[in-house]
């Protein structure tokens, strides 16, 4: 900690510890904040020793300036370095908020001085600030190397996303205004995916050969004061120097070798993305339970990888987005009409596939099923052509109503036989057994018992005869025939014992 905190000593350290972290706050800067800043610089591949001087702080702020829209930690690092710069320059600031404001004022004043110096030298053109090629105070076009932050961001995108469709716009944004040398630096930082990089090199070589075919080199010596025309390998940065690239890009008329080379790289990246994303836009279909928003995200992600013109992509969006939706969303989208915007589609299909939509669909299905079942029951009742049941009152004996609704005086006793002492459910009058015979019978025992059989009063005599058969009585046989009709047990089970 002591080695990293040695950037300040004596009066500078006292001034550092008087600056507040927030406007009106109690906490102030300490040595630990310098230690934290040095650690963060290591993450961005910047030299920690730059914190020891004001010029080093300026160089750090130039590298961090394009990334101020990043994370909170990155903004805190920039503000800490700006505060440290004010301490080195002995600029009095009360808190962290005043330090970036002072740095911004100094930058504006320096730019005005550079422009004024250029005008005094007879150059009426404004100073070019097109990064990475800028014009210095002497009017010379100089190149600023690509920042480590840009390279780090590009490497992270390739590592995390591989070669998904969003890599192409990220590369285009990070390489804005870059020279062929800067573009080659970005490509060389990619460690893995060498098969993809070889495909990219093949595409670049093909485009360079096509450029040489369309733009043949001028024969003979080049007139003095003119620059040679770039070849395909010059545009790719293999046979041209950085100064030649700057002259081509800043000449009048300019030859944008950086933009041409960038188009070649993007063309190769499109081929790689198509290889890494083999799914066709025709195969993107919404699942039965997939939310419409997730389906749209997958659709447009695959659409970005398609090699087609903007008109064709517009037709795909208008046609396939609705055609490949699930039946629920397709019904809603077709009801909106062909001129519906994506926002209207997203709003109309919001909630389709979610719990509330599932519950609503289930309730509708159950109501339809119950309605169909009720209709079937009514049809069965209406089509039933059996004998109509006659309702008869047990109290008065009339038809058309039940006994509980009868207005006549309540009859005493059994409603079936008229006798008192028991109820109708206990009445045995004219009760038939399972053979259909009225029970109790006036002829004695019920029909399902043996008739005219004397009950033994003592155990039967022991019989020691084997194989003896008892001959049936010839006199009893006709009586049994009379007692047992066709519905008797004898007719069902054969001879009774």
Curated annotation (Swiss-Prot):
The record marks 131-132, 362-363, 378-379, 433-434, 449-450 as: Cleavage. The keyword Lipoprotein applies. One of its GO terms (biological process) is viral budding via host ESCRT complex. Residues 276-362 are annotated as: Dimerization/Multimerization of capsid protein p24. GO terms for cellular component: host cell nucleus; host cell plasma membrane; host multivesicular body; membrane; viral nucleocapsid; virion membrane. It comes from the Viruses. The modification Asymmetric dimethylarginine is found at residues 388, 410. Residues 107-126, 440-497 are annotated as: Disordered. GO terms for molecular function: RNA binding; structural molecule activity; zinc ion binding. A motif (Nuclear localization signal) lies at residues 26-32. Keywords: AIDS, Capsid protein, Host cell membrane, Host cytoplasm, Host endosome, Host membrane, Host nucleus, Host-virus interaction, Lipoprotein, Membrane, Metal-binding, Methylation, Myristate, Phosphoprotein, Repeat, RNA-binding, Viral budding, Viral budding via the host ESCRT complexes, Viral nucleoprotein, Viral release from host cell, Virion, Zinc, Zinc-finger. A motif (Nuclear export signal) lies at residues 16-22. Residues 216-224 are annotated as: PPIA/CYPA-binding loop. Transmembrane segments: none annotated. Residues 108-126 have a biased composition (Polar residues). A motif (PTAP/PSAP motif) lies at residues 456-459. Late-budding domains (L domains) are short sequence motifs essential for viral particle budding. They recruit proteins of the host ESCRT machinery (Endosomal Sorting Complex Required for Transport) or ESCRT-associated proteins. p6-gag contains two L domains: a PTAP/PSAP motif, which interacts with the UEV domain of TSG101 and a LYPX(n)L motif which interacts with PDCD6IP/AIP1. HIV-1 lineages are divided in three main groups, M (for Major), O (for Outlier), and N (for New, or Non-M, Non-O). The vast majority of strains found worldwide belong to the group M. Group O seems to be endemic to and largely confined to Cameroon and neighboring countries in West Central Africa, where these viruses represent a small minority of HIV-1 strains. The group N is represented by a limited number of isolates from Cameroonian persons. The group M is further subdivided in 9 clades or subtypes (A to D, F to H, J and K). This is Gag polyprotein. It comes from Human immunodeficiency virus type 1 group M subtype G (isolate 92NG083). The gene is gag.
